[in-house]
A protein has these predicted regions:
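Class I SAM-binding transferase module
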Residues: 1-54, 58-355
Length: 355
């Protein structure tokens, strides 16, 4: 992604004083609904508990927690938006429950060395980690969360899949009866220097999605997030044009358990098949010479590395490399149509029958 932003930690928080950003997030219905259902659908987890909201923004998640019966909610917001959050809290008559602090969570202190039962945060960035604030949430977890405390969300998964990108390729072949291939080519060259945030239709995915990484937010460390790598041979599940790779994420929330019932798990998904969110999907476009027509069961070999930017640690650099499916090791059994995999699958099937 673009790394031209100065390595100024204050600039990150200042950007969140733009109310248009918060209008976008508050208008994101899947995002709002997931947090509301996860919190208000688990009132038994919040009733009488102490909650820490990291990066509280307008305070809406803190209000959900108060509505769910939390005894005390500490809403920490590093930007001047904290003043508006206080007004929103007052407007909803929760001043006795929600306390808003204008500071970074790294500078925050809970009174009397109190510990939080639950940490709530909407920290996710593009492809989960880019321009997000997970490091601050993990700091809060280690500093303030009780040993048996809960994280909302509590897990996160990054997926990757080969895809077609007709909006960047096919549409320029005939635009209102005019060939604009040269424009499309120039546009792709301009865009290929960094990943793009796009809406990808589910029918343009050539694979259902491979898990690049899964994070347990009670256990993962900031150091483990410095670099994440996937090296895979995926098998195309439908025919189509390989023009890029699509990245998205899911987050899950804890579900309460009791003798009477177990509340259903809430998932916030940015999968192309799910309702669109403001995160959309992240797409790495391939150079034109690397694009190819795929048949179902064709193998696609690649490696992708997400590396924390050295100058701005909230940003991540992506490095995609196409590999030779002939020489790369395939998962077993492999469903691709390469001869070696067909023979190996037949051999494994024979062994199972004999067994």
């Amino acid at each position: 992604m673009d790394n031209t932003e100065e390595a100024d930690p204050g600039a990150y928080f200042d950007s969140y004083e733009d109310l248009k950003i918060h209008e976008l997030m508050l208008s994101d219905e899947p995002r709002q609904t997931a947090y509301q259902n996860a919190i208000l659908g688990n009132r038994q987890l919040f009733a009488g508990k102490t909650v820490l909201d990291v990066g509280a923004g307008t305070g809406i998640l803190s209000l959900f927690c108060a509505q769910a019966g939390a005894r005390k909610v500490y809403a920490v917001e590093a930007s001047n938006l904290a003043h508006l959050a206080r007004a929103v809290v007052k407007e909803n008559n929760f001043e006795q429950v929600i306390e808003v602090s204008e500071c970074k969570v790294e500078e925050f202190r809970l009174p009397n060395d109190e510990r939080a039962d639950i940490i709530v945060s909407e920290w996710m960035g593009f492809f989960l980690l880019h321009e997000g604030m997970l490091d601050s949430v993990l700091y809060a977890r280690d500093k303030f969360l009780k040993p048996n405390g809960l994280m909302f969300p509590n897990t996160a998964t990054i997926y990757i899949a080969p895809c077609s990108v007709p909006s960047r390729f096919d549409r320029w072949e005939n635009l209102s009866g005019v060939s604009m291939k040269c424009f499309g080519r120039a546009l792709r060259e301009q865009c290929s220097s960094k990943p793009e945030v796009l809406t990808v239709a589910s029918e343009h995915l050539l694979h259902e999605g491979h898990v690049m990484t899964w994070l347990d937010l009670k256990e993962v460390t900031s150091e483990e997030l410095n670099s994440i790598e996937a090296k895979e041979v995926l098998v195309a599940q439908r025919e189509g044009k390989l023009q890029g790779f699509c990245i998205w994420f899911d987050c899950t929330f804890p579900a309460a358990e009791s003798d009477e019932q177990m509340s259903s798990e809430v998932i916030l998904s940015t999968n192309p098949s799910a309702p669109e969110t403001h995160w959309k999907q992240t797409v790495i476009l391939l150079p034109e010479q690397a694009c190819e027509e795929l048949e179902a069961r064709d193998p696609v070999a690649f490696s992708l590395t997400m590396t924390r930017n050295q100058e701005t640690n909230r940003r991540y650099d992506l490095q995609l490399t196409l590999l030779d499916a002939e020489t790369e090791e395939h998962n077993l059994p492999c469903e691709c149509q390469m001869t070696k995999c067909i023979l190996m699958k037949a051999h494994l099937d024979t062994m199972q029958v004999d067994g």
